Every structure is written in structure tokens, then in C-alpha cells.
């Protein structure tokens, strides 16, 4: 332990925590080091998926604002990493891995429009059109019933392009 004034810190030369490993993996994935191949990036995403056990615990007493911010930060980093891995897996034509990673992202951010679009695109490429319809319809239902809103125009266009088989329309993932 290191102390400075009223602050306390962990000496990273002697202690490694799961959050430190998470941050290091997320940094490597999101910053896309030049010497990292697509397969290495996918492996890093799968390790991150294994490491991430869900949203950070938020205590139910005292000032919890720090924990709430950290929870949101880690969740966003996780989803962004899964999205990056899914896109790389698609580029490598590895649909099972792309599907695994996008499903992990959907579990953590079921209302994020970019995740919905990417999931629809991956499901469509894998021939899972029924799942595209179910995902989109459930997304629309939640938005209309709970948030009194509609999907973003890009999401609507992506869905229509998949359903109508219009490959000329760019699927915005």
C-alpha cells in the first residue's frame, strides 16, 4: 500500500487486480495496437469477456456516485470492446465468434442502437433472420412502451434493408 496525504493506493509492482487486467485488455483492444492481428484482438476480447463478470457492485449506503460512474464506465468499455471484436470477427468471416461477442454486448447494453444494428447485421449474415425480426420488434416495443420513443433512423433503415433484402442499402453497423 502506498499513502500520500490522505490518499491510499496499491503499488502495482506487487499487486495486480481484475480491474487492472480489465483496463489493460480494454486499452489494447480499443486502441488497436499496430502489431496486433485480428485473431489476437479476438482472443483479447474473449479473455475480456471471461474476465468481466457483470456490472460493478454499487454499495447501498453513503455516497455511491463514484461507484455508479465506475459501473457505467466499465460497462461502456466492455460493450465497446465486444463491438470492436465482433467487427474484426466479421472481417475475418468468423460468424460464430462475431455472434458470441455481439450477444455479450447485447446482454450489457440491450438498448444501445449501434449494438442493435451490429447484432441485426451479424444475425442476417448467419442466416438468422427470425432473430433479426425478434430483436428489432422487441427493441421497438421497449422504446415505444417504456421510453415513448422510436428507433434511430439508421436502425430502421438497417432493419428494412435486411427484411426487404435490399443489399444496395448500406447496413450501418
Segments and roles (model prediction):
Residues 1-173:
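Intrinsically disordered, charged and Pro/Gly-enriched terminal/linker segments
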Amino acid at each position: 500500500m502506498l499513502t500520500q496525504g490522505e490518499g491510499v493506493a496499491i503499488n502495482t509492482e506487487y499487486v495486480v487486480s481484475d480491474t487492472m487486467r480489465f483496463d489493460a485488455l480494454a486499452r489494447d483492444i480499443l486502441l488497436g495496437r499496430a502489431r496486433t492481428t485480428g485473431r489476437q484482438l479476438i482472443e483479447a476480447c474473449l479473455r475480456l469477456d471471461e474476465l468481466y463478470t457483470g456490472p460493478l457492485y454499487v454499495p447501498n449506503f453513503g455516497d455511491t456516485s463514484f461507484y455508479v460512474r465506475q459501473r457505467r464506465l466499465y460497462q461502456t468499455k466492455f460493450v465497446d470492446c465486444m463491438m470492436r471484436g465482433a467487427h474484426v470477427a466479421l472481417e475475418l468471416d468468423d460468424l460464430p465468434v462475431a455472434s458470441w461477442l455481439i450477444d455479450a454486448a447485447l446482454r450489457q447494453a440491450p438498448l444501445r442502437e449501434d449494438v442493435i444494428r451490429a447484432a441485426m447485421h451479424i444475425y442476417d449474415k448467419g442466416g438468422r433472420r427470425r432473430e433479426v425480426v425478434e430483436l428489432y420488434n422487441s427493441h421497438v416495443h421497449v422504446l415505444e412502451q417504456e421510453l415513448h420513443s422510436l428507433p434511430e433512423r439508421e436502425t430502421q433503415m438497417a432493419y428494412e434493408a435486411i427484411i426487404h433484402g435490399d443489399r444496395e442499402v448500406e447496413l450501418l453497423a
